[in-house]
């Protein structure tokens, strides 16, 4: 028996070691040396995804040192003009991985190795996986400096912690591994009532009522209209917002539980996030309303094409059926909790009765787009192919062409998958390579002329038109030599910058591109011998228009 026990423990230890998991729990330190103040937290429902980390504010400036939260090794280094920008991945000896994003620069030894790799590949953008023993990191070691790189709206550190085996981001705000001041409970601003109508024989939910919420004398929330009447299947959506102490930045909530007459019919909690399902955040919120408000409008409803694993209870998908008797009430009690366990309750009643809801969903010149089957719209001017499971629930939509504009559904309806628009257009042969689609905001949306048709693959319903990009990108030199840099401003009027190449004295030179500021920066080598240098910059847009400048600069 003892031998079997020893063998089992040895096997367990070996298994955990192979998986990179230690039985010893790690104590994580802060990645910064100042009190943490957040501009974003884990679980915020952002455009097409859940936010996966803590956004630690940098006080409006770049350059603060970033420290490794635990002992480990650098397992990945990612550099891009987009997304996390300059990002460092440190895997710890319990198997978890910390991600540090939007960095200004890496620690010198890491930065030099990355630069060597960039020159070897002749690319600013790189995705690198260093050998495990190349960069061993101590707890508290400076590994990088806080920045504003990539798709960042201001200086901050994006920090996340990913689980050992799944590599899914964990809700480190809720696990409270760092000290973050927060005794502010979530705020309920409104409650929206959606009723099920039948349009062309298809059940469709539409907004029936929006009621303001207010705090009562006990500090909890109620509706300004305490009883909502309904006579059809319904669901509720809650307009909620949350803050941290002393901050005006809005946060996502951790969990919500809705009870009907004391029985839970809907509950979710965001303990972790899966990259494979994160886009279903579009169905987690009431998409069109969330786009219009500061905060989240969270649906107490699970749409049929919503594969999020964060729902723990959803009786009848959160749909509430009206009582049989006229005037009979249902007591709704909903508890909303933030990631520091501050909670808010709201109570009100639903009762069977006339909601006075007038269905405004059009039933003429519309198409039914099912969530669970392929759909194709076709007319004399275009075809639109929408694969099954592209929309989150069956939708009623309009498709039309007026001689210039292609109306493809409604931009307030989100998409999970790509759809394909094909249009029959008589485009002059010399312009076919320059043609592209433009969306309702006037921005280039892509598209190519293929086999006699303009083809667009998109994940956005919108109104599109066809335009032509025949203008080469613009290049301007900005303050040459300032701060030991050679800086350019590169822009394109429509299709966007596709690539660039900088050479100095005929050799490829590293240049950092930041689309936010349209800047391209080459940093001089330290202790370089002052001399005149021949510079060539080539910029190509997505319609293959090319601009090349040649100049000479001395440094």
Q: For each predicted feature, which ranges?
A:
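Short beta-strand elements
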Residues: 212-213, 254, 340-360, 549-555
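Proteolytic processing hotspots in large secreted/extracellular or virion-associated proteins
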Residues: 357-359, 364, 369-370, 392-436
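Surface-exposed, short loops/turns at beta-strand junctions within beta-sandwich domains
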Residues: 322-329, 457-460, 524-532
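Surface-exposed, glycine-biased beta-strand/turn segments
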Residues: 23-97, 104-109, 123-133, 138-139, ...
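Low-complexity, Pro/Ser/Thr- and charge-rich linker/hinge segments at domain boundaries
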Residues: 168-193, 202, 266, 352-374, ...
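Exoplasmic/lumenal beta-rich domain surfaces
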Residues: 97-133, 199-223, 259-321, 498-528
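Conserved structural position at the C-terminal beta-strand
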Residues: 240, 336, 539-541
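Proteolytic cleavage junctions
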Residues: 366-370, 374, 409-413, 426-434, ...
